């Protein structure tokens, strides 16, 4: 019955993705909608009373945990490869500074003053979740609405800077708790240097070792973030390109149809949504839904004003909404925190719901088309509102 549930879940995600595309939604939005609303209803009305299966039962098989580790490592590796592939741009840095700092500070304040007492690293994680954005989803959305290439590059580089800061801060904060959990991944991250000393230069070998060791690190609960960031930085220093384990098209299909649905389902079935909403309280729930979005929009607005207009006719309001998009990065981060028991199930659900709202905001604001006047270069030093 457990295997039947997981097959059914994958089929439901495939159907949701297909239906969403008919309405112009990118896959991650359809998947978030199903995970946030459909799966909890399915668990409450059918799986738990009818099949007599709890969330703990559904995630207990060893084969499923191995498949989860593999899927998580593939997604984390892909995200980190996007983060590390950075060509620093001064305008992107101007946007990223307030876009990260303001929601991060707001998240820390929320964790300390509005949420129940928790370890400092959990409060840090809440601050980072307020600030994080979504590189793949942002890029796909910008491409979907035919946003100007130069403006797209600037926004994506801003997202990369923010995500790199979030992942790196959390990785070292986590490693500081247990020195052994920091040293072992750092030693593994130096493998590219050893391979170069052995005169081995094939990018496929470096990349294969990266994904294999990332799976091992995730499976044995080592600090996969420290390993992943360090390994890719070594590869970048050696000018060795990362080669994905599968062709790009196949990798995209694997993520869309298996890895992302598996990770979303693995997280959401562990949550009793009714109890989660009751335990949070109205003020806490409202804060977790509204403050991340509001503080992120404020940071984006200030950063875009500091950096200046990206093209004639660009709107600070529209670009602020675009940089508020969450998605895959947030999902992976949330699951990482939930599996390590650094956040509660109710906090997981509230922030996933917030991420869905933030990701839908550009579409709800009517951003299906870009401004007509996009060809002329910018003359003003400030973006239009």
Give residue ranges: language-model regions.
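Structural signature of hydrophobic alpha-helical transmembrane segments
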Residues: 1-9, 58-75, 118-133, 177-190, ...
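Membrane-interface alpha-helices at helix entry/exit sites of multi-pass transporters
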Residues: 147-171, 245-247, 314-319, 342-352
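Transmembrane alpha-helices that form the ion-translocation and gating core
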Residues: 43-45, 86-147, 277-373
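Hydrophobic alpha-helical transmembrane segments in multi-pass integral membrane proteins
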Residues: 43-48, 107-112, 163-176, 212-226, ...
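Core mid-bundle transmembrane helix pairs that form the ion/substrate translocation pathway
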Residues: 7-10, 14-21, 161-245, 253-256
């Amino acid at each position: 019955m457990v295997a039947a549930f997981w097959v059914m879940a994958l089929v439901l995600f495939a159907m949701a993705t297909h239906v969403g595309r008919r309405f112009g939604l990118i896959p991650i939005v359809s998947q978030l909608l199903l995970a946030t609303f459909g799966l909890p209803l399915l668990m409450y009305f059918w799986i738990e009373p009818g099949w007599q299966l709890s969330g703990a039962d559904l995630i207990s098989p060893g084969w499923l945990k191995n498949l989860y580790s593999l899927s998580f490592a593939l997604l984390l590796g892909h995200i980190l490869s996007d983060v590390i592939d950075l060509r620093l741009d001064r305008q992107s840095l101007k946007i990223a500074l307030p876009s990260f700092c303001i929601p991060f500070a707001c998240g820390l304040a929320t964790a300390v003053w509005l949420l129940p007492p928790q370890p400092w690293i959990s409060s840090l994680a809440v601050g980072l979740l307020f600030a994080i954005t979504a590189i793949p989803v942002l890029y796909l959305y910008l491409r979907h609405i035919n946003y100007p290439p130069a403006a797209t590059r600037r926004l994506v580089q801003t997202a990369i800077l923010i995500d790199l800061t979030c992942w790196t801060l959390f990785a070292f904060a986590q490693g500081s708790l247990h020195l052994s959990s920091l040293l072992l991944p750092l030693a593994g991250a130096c493998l590219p240097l050893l391979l170069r000393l052995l005169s081995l230069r094939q990018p496929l070998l470096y990349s294969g070792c990266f994904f294999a060791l990332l799976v091992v690190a995730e499976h044995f609960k080592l600090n996969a973030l420290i390993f992943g960031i360090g390994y890719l930085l070594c590869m970048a220093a050696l000018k060795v390109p990362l080669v994905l384990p599968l062709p790009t098209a196949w990798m995209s299909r694997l993520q869309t149809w298996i890895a992302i649905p598996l990770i979303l389902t693995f997280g959401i079935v562990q949550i009793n949504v009714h109890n989660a909403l009751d335990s949070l309280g109205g003020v806490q729930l409202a804060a977790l839904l509204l403050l991340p979005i509001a503080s992120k929009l404020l940071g984006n607005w200030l950063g875009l004003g500091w950096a200046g207009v990206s093209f004639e006719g660009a709107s600070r309001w529209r670009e602020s909404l675009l940089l508020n998009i969450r998605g895959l990065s947030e999902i992976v981060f949330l699951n990482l925190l939930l599996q390590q028991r650094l956040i509660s199930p109710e906090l997981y659900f509230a922030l996933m719901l917030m991420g869905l709202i933030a990701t839908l905001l550009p579409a709800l604001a009517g951003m299906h088309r870009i401004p007509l006047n996009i060809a002329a270069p910018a003359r003003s030093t400030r973006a239009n509102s």
